[in-house]
Amino acid sequence: MKFLDQAKVYVRSGDGGAGCVSFRREKFIEFGGPDGGDGGRGGDVWIECVDGLNTLIDYRYQQHFKAKKGDHGKGANRTGARGSDVVLRVPAGTQILDETEETVLADLTEVGQRIKLLEGGNGGFGNAQFKTSTNQAPRRANPGLEGQERWIWLRLKLIADAGLVGLPNAGKSTFLAATTAAKPKIADYPFTTLHPGLGVVRVDGREFVLADIPGLIEGAHEGVGIGDRFLGHVERCRALLHLVDGTSEHAGKAYKTVRAELAAYGNGLDEKPEIVALSKVDALSPELLKQQKERLKRAAKKTPLLLSAQSGQGVQEALRLLLSVVEEERGAEKAEEPRDAWRP
């Protein structure tokens, strides 16, 4: 399935139906009086978070969504039918922003969340509403109110417990494929991964979601390479596994490059709990392994894990450590959630 994480969409709620000018006509009733019904209300625009979606690809092919108009009122005091709503279905993690992309209108993080984005126009009054003691046969009715319209941006930030970050070809996709059922494209050239990928990791009977983020290079926050567009998906991660290619020229410099890009992006990415690992260690000689490990240790100011997704060395240790950090963060988030005060 193709991946799309942002889309610009036009939405419009339905116009209200017009009121009706009508008079009661029955045999033997000479002055039946007004009986024009009100117009129906226009349909609303809703956005709903549903299960089974992980991309906004549907909104590449359809960008305009309009709710139905309300029906006009009818005689015999019959109100027009309400216009049907239009519902935009999005995956969990979708933000709704205004046209300028500066104001977040809603953030849908849980399946089942549903918000009313635009309200349909009210129906107009029929002539029965205008009957007074001095005007027993009004010949006026109101038109329905117009619906609302606006352009919005849908922006998806994948919800994952942990994220894989690193330079291109650091072994992130290989690690994801080795630890989950995901099947990312793997090749020996930079930027093999062009879109984020998700997989479910199972460790000791417990699970967490792992995201593979496309590689960063120096200047990504300024648009170099594929830029930092996909770093938004890291914002929701509770922890990061930073993979540094052991076969790179200098492991310490590679680590610092990615850390600089995380700091330049902002939004607290450089403050997230981080586990540092030297990858592809099966391809290193003992002397080079020791040298790269020391370089990375000095740069990260912590002892890195040594792992190889191909041979399986250090993989389970990394996953268990990642799981412990994720569960610790989950517990901290639950502790911070406000609890309703008890009331008798």
Curated annotation (Swiss-Prot):
Record key words, sorted: Cytoplasm, GTP-binding, Hydrolase, Magnesium, Metal-binding, Nucleotide-binding
Signal peptide limits: none
Top-level class of the enzyme under EC nomenclature: hydrolase
Domain of life: Bacteria
Gene Ontology process terms (BP): ribosome biogenesis
Any matching Pfam family: MMR_HSR1
UniProt GO MF annotations: GTP binding; GTPase activity; magnesium ion binding
GO cellular component: cytoplasm
Chain positions recorded as GTP binding sites: 166-173, 191-195, 212-215, 279-282, 308-310
Main subcellular location of this protein, as a coarse class: cytoplasm
Cofactor(s) listed in the protein's UniProt record: Mg(2+)
Subunit structure of this chain's protein: Monomer.
The protein, known as: GTPase Obg
Species of provenance: Xanthobacter autotrophicus (strain ATCC BAA-1158 / Py2)
